[in-house]
Amino acid sequence: MSEGAAGASPPGAASAAAASAEEGTAAAAAAAAAGGGPDGGGEGAAEPPRELRCSDCIVWNRQQTWLCVVPLFIGFIGLGLSLMLLKWIVVGSVKEYVPTDLVDSKGMGQDPFFLSKPSSFPKAMETTTTTTSTTSPATPSAGGAASSRTPNRISTRLTTITRAPTRFPGHRVPIRASPRSTTARNTAAPPTVLSTTAPFFSSSTPGSRPPMPGAPSTQAMPSWPTAAYATSSYLHDSTPSWTLSPFQDAAAASSSSPSSTSSTTTTPETSTSPKFHTTTYSTERSEHFKPCRDKDLAYCLNDGECFVIETLTGSHKHCRCKEGYQGVRCDQFLPKTDSILSDPTDHLGIEFMESEDVYQRQVLSISCIIFGIVIVGMFCAAFYFKSKKQAKQIQEHLKESQNGKNYSLKASSTKSESLMKSHVHLQNYSKADRHPVTALEKIMESSFSAPQSFPEVTSPDRGSQPIKHHSPGQRSGMLHRNTFRRAPPSPRSRLGGIVGPAYQQLEESRIPDQDTIPCQGIEVRKTISHLPIQLWCVERPLDLKYVSNGLRTQQNASINMQLPSRETNPYFNSLDQKDLVGYLSPRANSVPIIPSMGLEETCMQMPGISDVKSIKWCKNSYSADIVNASMPVSDCLLEEQQEVKILLETVQEQIRILTDARRSEDFELASMETEDSASENTAFLPLSPTAKSEREAQFVLRNEIQRDSVLTK
């Protein structure tokens, strides 16, 4: 709308247009605060759902679970293997059952087994020959003996060869001789068997002297020692060879008749008859044990006893093993289970181990395996529960932070809605003349922020004062000047109580002398509890009585201004129609003044109103600490110049502080935005610290130059 159209339109139409524009601005601000963007809608626009992101803690939880299960599984496998090892040690070492009749009671399972007595006597006692058949036929030797030998068997065949006439006196049947056996039948009386012991395969010669009557013919004893009892022995294959003991020979001799003769004896009646030769029993002695020589002592292992057995085939080394070992050289371990099975009467219980030491070692090894598995399981369980607790704490922290962000978004939207409904009256600004006004017109009265809200100070004759109307250009310039640019989000609203989050930039006023505002006073308004206090410059005629009382009550006041925060943006952007109606109200002749960025406390001294006779100027500056009312005009100008110098120094110091603060804020903001992708949405990107400081310095210096030019006029 052009200025002419604005001048022609009624005041109500202008107010309605401004109200509609501000309504749209407020809606956009509310949508931006809610995070919905420009297309967010109006007051009732719902907050868009946030994107759900998969948390890394869940994946790490599953990985930790698998990392804990795998060692437990391996531990159980080890336990099973150890049990199988124990079973193999106890059960797998038991040998097959060995019959007890083939095992010596002395524990010599591999040694020959000796019988105390023969099971039966040899048959056909009337004959002089006892033969033992073998698997291989015998070969007769030159001396009349036949013998055969297999690798593991020794057998002996004894034969009797008779060289006599075909007929023997007193016998009907001739004696037949064969190379294998000799049979003599005596019809008169049983033959007399004489006990003779002769060397193996020995026979009588034809020229031998016959024995005396009644005396047995004997020959020399063998050169090797004999045992008291002749027994049969197992030689590698346990093949028996039966012989007669001396006691049995004596019994047989005593029971025979002296009148009878055998093949080896003759009676006196037949002394002239030719003699025949025969062989007697020969005994194979296999029980001759001799200790081994010194060089053969190492033949038996595991403390076995070495001895030599001399047989017909030669000497053989044998080992008498200790209990628990077996084999040719005692090199095989034999558990006690074999001895239990072989001789259960010697053991009342069942023992599975070879000795107490072996048993203790095996029990200790199995116990160590089980204990190690339990320890590993405990450590794994503790690590799992600790990780689970940490993950739960992290999830709770993320949930709390997410709830805090949602709460901040909802709070900002609620504040914007409350600002739209609040009755804040922005007052129009009336541009004053550039030339100074004569004395005793306008003074300033100031009220400063305090913890409680400040009531508005009204004048009794304020309603009768004339109202100054302003052009739409002036109003738009004032609105444009009073609109703040949105500051970037900061994690802190104040920096250690020294400086707060400063505005990035204040729009330059279209009015060149915006910092030199002739006004009647400054009044403090605080319409909303959570917003900072605003200073408003109000134009009205001087009321000496009111001003005098006001100045006296404000002596020695301290400045304690709260810095503006991010919530001040909706304060100017969310205005409804009721707020804009105030432009045409009797109080529509004021403009907000930005308070000082520093938090200095200054004492303001105000003289009496009766001494004030010059023009007083209200300053709208970044660093206007205090405006003092002085008595004469010349003194006021001097104070203004001094104040400008002080103001420049203060501005430079504050610019330096703001630059450092914003650099730290930008660094923290950048780090937080990179770490948390779900940070709050920002309307504008932050400027670099150098650009900010340069623009602020240019803005402040330009304002000070304009102020100096006005004061020098």
Swiss-Prot record:
Protein keywords: Cell membrane, Disulfide bond, EGF-like domain, Growth factor, Membrane, Secreted, Transmembrane, Transmembrane helix
Taxonomic superkingdom: Eukaryota
PTM description: Proteolytic cleavage close to the plasma membrane on the external face leads to the release of the soluble growth factor form.
Keyword Transmembrane in annotation: yes
Topology Extracellular: residue spans: 1-362
Transmembrane segments: 363-383
Coiled-coil boundaries: none
Tissue: Expressed in sympathetic, motor, and sensory neurons.
InterPro entries: EGF-like_dom (IPR000742), Neuregulin (IPR040180)
Family that this chain belongs to: Belongs to the neuregulin family.
Protein name as annotated: Pro-neuregulin-3, membrane-bound isoform
Gene encoding the protein: Nrg3
